[in-house]
């Protein structure tokens, strides 16, 4: 863990604030990587993940952006209402689950709303490398889009395209046309609300884009509860202990109650922290972290949100 001080906070769009962290001991932070995020420990014991958006390679400070979301489980509310300049908070070292691919001919970046934060960091990295890219930034309106004025005058402004729901029709996003015009060497990166990401990714797949060219990061998972959810068992491979997982509890909650600790963070199947190997049984994958190919192997799952299709899952614990 790293203790940091909030050195600056500013409103960058309606309901979006940017926070700047500096190391409390005055030292250097691990360098920023494009696509990386940090875990921020918030008041009330909450831990939330926020992408870094400042210049890749920076070590003097970190910058994150936080949307105050009415559907929040408490994290964004805690940031907006409880954090203030000068306060000390604990953060993790950066982790990168959304990196830029090496050796790519061209990159197509799609950001929806607050999803601009990791995408902005990627754009800065690609511009510094002098690599070919295009950034498409979508938002409901200009006042709800962060960093717009800066993007209009930055060094790579000619690579940026804006798409606002309340703008003229000719500037609205036409994902099908954009994706159809790209060569096979182009890779796609997308971050934003689930519906936005689903539209971009589904359009790409319909046009034959290979999965290894599609890169995504989810900020929040849509509710994934089924009325047909039932109970099932998990068996601990090392001890043979059998635990019942009721319909209204997750595997990680049941394991925790039994004193079996599996690290969790997002609790929504987004971050990959809790991935656990499956020895036997068939998981019901409900996460947004594993790829379709990884899910098809059924040899790992996310106990924070995924369940079981079989009567029992044997876990490598």
Curated annotation (Swiss-Prot):
[2Fe-2S] cluster binds at residues 266, 271, 274, 304. Its EC number is 1.14.13.-. Residues 1-101 form the FAD-binding FR-type domain. One of its GO terms (molecular function) is oxidoreductase activity. It comes from the Bacteria. SUPFAM superfamilies: 2Fe-2S ferredoxin-like (SSF54292), Ferredoxin reductase-like, C-terminal NADP-linked domain (SSF52343), Riboflavin synthase domain-like (SSF63380). This demethylase system consists of two proteins: an oxygenase and an oxygenase reductase. This is Vanillate O-demethylase oxidoreductase.
């Amino acid at each position: 863990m790293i203790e940091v001080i909030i050195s600056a906070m500013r409103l960058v769009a309606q309901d979006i604030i940017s926070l700047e962290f500096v190391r409390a001991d005055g030292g250097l932070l691990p360098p920023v990587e494009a696509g990386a995020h940090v875990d921020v420990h918030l008041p009330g014991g909450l831990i939330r993940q926020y992408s870094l958006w400042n210049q890749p390679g920076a070590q003097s400070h970190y910058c994150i952006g936080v949307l105050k979301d009415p559907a929040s489980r408490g994290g964004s509310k805690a940031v907006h209402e409880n954090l203030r300049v000068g306060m000390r908070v604990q953060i993790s070292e950066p982790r990168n689950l959304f990196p830029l691919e090496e050796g790519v001919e061209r990159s197509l970046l799609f950001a929806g709303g607050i999803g601009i934060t990791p995408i902005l960091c990627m754009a800065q990295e690609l511009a510094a490398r002098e690599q070919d890219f295009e950034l498409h930034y979508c938002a409901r309106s200009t006042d709800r889009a962060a960093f717009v004025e800066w993007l209009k005058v930055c060094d790579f402004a000619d690579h940026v395209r804006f798409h606002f729901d309340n703008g003229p029709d000719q500037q609205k996003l036409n994902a099908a046309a954009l994706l159809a015009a790209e060569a096979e060497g182009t890779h796609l990166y997308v971050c934003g609300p689930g519906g936005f990401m689903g539209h971009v990714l589904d359009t790409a797949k319909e046009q034959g884009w290979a999965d290894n060219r599609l890169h995504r990061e989810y900020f929040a998972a849509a509710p994934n509860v089924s009325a047909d959810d039932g109970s099932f068992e998990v068996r601990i491979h090392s001890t043979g202990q059998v635990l019942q997982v009721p319909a209204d509890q997750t595997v990680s909650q049941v394991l925790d109650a039994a004193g079996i600790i599996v690290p969790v963070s997002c609790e929504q199947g987004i971050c990959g922290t809790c991935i656990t190997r499956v020895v036997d049984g068939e998981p019901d994958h409900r996460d947004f972290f594993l790829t379709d190919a990884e899910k098809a192997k059924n040899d790992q799952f996310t106990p924070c949100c995924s369940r079981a299709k079989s009567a029992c899952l044997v876990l490598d614990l």
